[in-house]
Amino acid sequence: MKILLACEESGVVRDAFSKLGHNAWSCDILPSRSPGQHYQCDVREVLYDDWDMVIAFPPCTDLCVSRARWFEQKRANGDQQRSIEFFMLFANHPCPRVAIENPVGIMSTLYRKPDMVLQPWQYGHGETKATCLWLRGLPLLKPTNIVSGREPRVHRMAPGPERARLRSQTYQGVADAMASQWGLA
């Protein structure tokens, strides 16, 4: 399958699909942190190419509840509305298989409830971080390796230049589940 991983600079999910033989491409305005097929551009430049599946990880800064204390400012300066419209590019995309990943946030009210909320500890990582998935044409992900030792590590990260990137990166176990389960869809 030809798969677009939108707003993914880590390459984690792209690489999981590529390892299973898929023609997977990541796209982000930043360069990819791992070698592989990557478009470094605004995703709108490639979004309407001929894709069999689109998995999107739109920026959550203006949408997630953990940033709610700044919502008034984000509404006033237009950032939140731009982020909503960007999210909806993926929700309204004509591809038959679409997944949109974002933390718990306002899209559950403005768009619709997510199809599922997963936790890293369901996929081999002893951490908590509720992650919503809105799906079309794809099955719910089944847990692959439920582990104990659940810590909210990402919520306790110290401020720093790498914090946002590390908090938003997809866990390897989740990426592998997406590839192994959705790669057959």
Q: Predicted segment positions?
A:
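Conserved active-site and SAM-binding loop architecture
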Residues: 1-185
